[in-house]
Curated annotation (Swiss-Prot):
Coiled coil: none annotated. One of its GO terms (cellular component) is cytosolic small ribosomal subunit. One of its GO terms (molecular function) is structural constituent of ribosome. Keywords: Ribonucleoprotein, Ribosomal protein. PANTHER family: 30S RIBOSOMAL PROTEIN S2 PROKARYOTIC AND ORGANELLAR, SMALL RIBOSOMAL SUBUNIT PROTEIN US2M. GO terms for biological process: translation. The keyword Ribosomal protein applies. Residues 250-272 have a biased composition (Low complexity). This is Small ribosomal subunit protein uS2. Residues 250-284 are annotated as: Disordered. PROSITE patterns: RIBOSOMAL_S2_1 (PS00962).
Length: 284
């Protein structure tokens, strides 16, 4: 059974790229066509690259590795936290702290401090202190929880990282590359494919697209964990109820089993979550 279907990708708006004036020429090979000034990503290639990334993640985890989930943009925060938590992997969905990978020894000390403060709060360690001291300690704990809560159990740098939007997460990407940590990431039409080891061409601005692809990676982790434990297959992402496809999108879907052809019908209105900038109706 396929890891994910063409229909699921279309339903989630994974095929919508940025406006044609905002692109990285290196992404040309991943572009199928453009419609009304918006690039349309070649989902046939997306499916192929998903399979490659899925296999890599599954094998990495099956052999004892870990995957860090990274996505701090608003559209990705919820799915990053949910899917990483589901499979017990570390995640960063708030601000990326410089040195989180390259200076992990210092970060680990801050994690120990977080656990120390939590233990104090739970065991009555705040008793006997002034209100001001308790307030300061509570603020410190909350700040550490917000920035490091997703990696609280991480004992070493991850084996690979999953990234939603390599442009926004350029610090994480740079640190991973410096340490030769493999990068799996969504590649929108404004991204640089040269910085990613396992690219997945797709829309990194739509909530449903980011959620679907993050779920795919988490499912690969789950399957790897089961293989590590000697179990069966992991849970594959399930199709969700979606709006009817526009006629041109149906043509893309119909062409999935044949040679792709440019669609000629007018595009439908994509989901409201595809674009976060108020000046453009679709992923710019």
């Amino acid at each position: 059974m396929a890891v994910v279907t063409m229909k699921q990708l279309l339903d989630s708006g994974t095929h919508f790229g940025h406006q044609t004036r905002r692109w990285n020429p290196k992404m040309k090979r991943f572009i199928f066509t453009d419609r009304n000034g918006i690039y349309i990503i070649d989902l046939q290639q997306t499916l192929t690259y998903i399979d490659k990334a899925y296999e890599f993640v599954k094998e990495t985890v099956a052999h004892g590795g870990s995957i860090m989930f990274v996505g701090t943009k608003k559209q990705a925060q919820e799915s990053i936290a949910e899917e990483a938590t589901r499979v017990g992997m570390p995640y960063v969905n708030q601000r990326w702290l410089g040195g989180m990978l390259t200076n992990f020894s210092t970060v680990h000390k801050r994690l120990q401090r977080l656990k120390e403060l939590e233990a104090m709060e739970q065991t009555g360690g705040f008793e006997g202190r002034t209100k001001k001291e308790i307030l300061m300690l509570t603020r410190e704990k909350n700040k550490l929880e917000r920035s490091l809560g997703g990696i609280r159990d991480m004992q070493k740098v991850p084996s690979a990282i999953w990234v939603v939007d390599t442009n926004k997460e350029h610090l994480a990407v740079a640190e991973a590359r410096k340490l030769n940590i493999p990068i799996i990431a969504i590649l929108d039409t404004n991204c640089d494919p040269d910085v990613v080891d396992y690219p997945i061409p797709g829309n990194d601005d739509a909530i449903r697209s980011a959620a679907l692809l993050t779920k795919v990676v988490a499912s690969a982790v789950a399957e790897g964990l089961q293989a590590r434990a000697g179990g069966g297959n992991g849970n594959k992402p399930e199709a969700e109820a979606a709006e009817p496809l526009a006629e041109w999108e149906q043509e893309l879907l119909a062409g999935a089993t044949a040679s792709p052809t440019a669609a000629g019908a007018a595009p439908g209105t994509p989901e409201a979550d595809i674009q976060t900038e108020p000046t453009a109706p679709q992923n710019p």
